[in-house]
């Protein structure tokens, strides 16, 4: 008896060749347009400019309160100049922020309260935007959201600064042992800054949305942001060096429009990274059907009900939204409004797995069919997702007999494989 040949997994080249690049680009473009992320980036840019001083004040207060971290502050400022902001405006912006932050202590209670409100407004805008991208319907309590972000604001610069201090210390020690730093070691040290930004973005995408986000998906988004940030910084620096339009027109005030452009570009990249992270599971599963034709939601509702009807006799009694999206070959966020409509009709209900902590992986509810198709009229579904009754279409309702049809008559056909 011949043994079956072992299955060889496809190589990474074959996976890249078979990857649905066109559908992926179409999905990401549609999500960016529907969520109006360009407008959101503009709003975040304006709020960020107002919140820069409060955030920088908090960081300086932390370093001032603990003189042991003075080295951390110096290295962190150097990293901001060399890595995060284009060199054309980095030193001027950092100088202005330091000057403004030092004067913030002279504000009264009213002025300081306005700064705090501005910082909190930026926090809530980021939180709301990311949760909208993940289609989260229930946000965390306000106090919990502010606490999470405030911890990130205060501890984030400290942790990042300590890592940069450690890397600079190792680099200094290495230079003392050898005349020139090996290229491989230099590449490792240069990669630390890149990975620090990627890790920060991965943490943002993993912890902020009030839903389960896998770490590997968050890291893909973080690496996407870190790569695009580096490319955008070099592109903007090259443009400003080649075409000094802003310096010629605005003179000494050129820093402000350049800073606004850079912040806007940065937020566009961060929001795109969130879209990549949120839609990566669907992209990897292979989205083959796109919305657009008439009656799309009604068609999805019928197929969802067909699958849930089949699962009534199974031990699970239902399906997760991700399972439904995989079987329907659609983006799970496209069927979310359909599931909400079926829930409003009390045709579909959700069951949460017992003993699972909220926010952890596995918290996705299972959808189950609650009605008996033999005794459930079809008219409510048609009215909600396809054709509302009116005097103009009343003859159609009467001739087709829609008012007298039951759900069972629509579920007789088997769903597509």
From Swiss-Prot:
One of its GO terms (cellular component) is plasma membrane. The chain crosses the membrane at residues 49-69, 106-126, 146-166, 187-207, 235-255, 256-276. It is a multi-pass membrane protein. Keywords: Cell inner membrane, Cell membrane, Membrane, Transmembrane, Transmembrane helix. It is found in: Cell inner membrane. It comes from the Bacteria. Belongs to the UPF0761 family. NCBIfam families: yihY_not_rbn (TIGR00765). This is UPF0761 membrane protein Daci_4966.
């Amino acid at each position: 008896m011949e043994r079956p040949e072992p299955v060889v997994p496809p190589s990474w080249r074959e996976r890249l060749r078979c990857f649905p690049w066109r559908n992926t680009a179409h999905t990401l473009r549609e999500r960016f347009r529907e969520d109006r992320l360009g407008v959101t980036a503009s709003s975040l840019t304006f709020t960020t400019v107002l919140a820069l001083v409060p955030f920088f004040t908090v960081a300086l207060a932390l370093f001032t309160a603990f003189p042991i971290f003075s080295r951390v502050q110096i290295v962190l400022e150097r990293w901001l100049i060399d890595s995060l902001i284009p060199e054309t405006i980095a030193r001027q912006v950092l100088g202005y922020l330091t000057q403004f932050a030092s004067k913030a202590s002279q504000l009264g209670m009213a002025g300081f309260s306005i700064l705090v409100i501005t910082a909190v407004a930026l926090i809530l805008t980021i939180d709301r935007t990311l949760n909208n991208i993940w289609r989260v319907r229930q946000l965390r309590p306000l106090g919990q959201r502010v606490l999470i972000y405030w911890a990130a604001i205060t501890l984030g610069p400290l942790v990042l600064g300590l890592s940069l201090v450690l890397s600079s210390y190792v680099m200094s020690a290495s230079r003392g042992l050898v005349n020139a730093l090996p290229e491989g070691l230099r590449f490792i040290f240069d990669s630390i800054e890149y990975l620090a930004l990627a890790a920060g973005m991965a943490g943002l995408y993993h912890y902020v949305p009030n839903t389960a986000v896998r770490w590997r998906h968050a890291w893909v988004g973080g690496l996407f942001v870190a790569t695009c940030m580096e490319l955008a910084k070099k592109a903007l620096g090259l443009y400003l060096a080649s075409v000094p339009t802003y310096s010629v027109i605005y003179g000494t005030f050129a820093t402000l429009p350049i800073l606004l452009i850079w912040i806007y570009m940065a937020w566009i990249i961060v929001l795109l990274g969130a879209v990549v992270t949120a839609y990566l599971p669907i992209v990897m599963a292979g989205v083959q059907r796109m919305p657009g034709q008439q009656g799309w939601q009604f068609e999805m509702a019928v197929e969802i009900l067909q699958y849930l009807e089949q699962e009534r006799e199974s031990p699970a009694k239902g399906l997760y939204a991700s399972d439904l999206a995989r079987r329907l070959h659609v983006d799970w966020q496209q069927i979310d409004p359909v599931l909400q409509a079926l829930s409003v009709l009390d045709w579909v209900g959700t069951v949460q797995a017992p003993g699972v902590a909220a926010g952890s992986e596995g918290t996705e509810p299972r959808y189950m069919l609650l009605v008996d198709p033999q005794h459930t009229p079809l008219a409510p579904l048609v009215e909600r997702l396809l054709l509302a009754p009116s005097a103009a279409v009343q003859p159609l309702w009467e001739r087709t007999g829609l008012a007298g049809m039951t759900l069972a008559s629509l579920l007789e056909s088997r769903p597509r494989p």
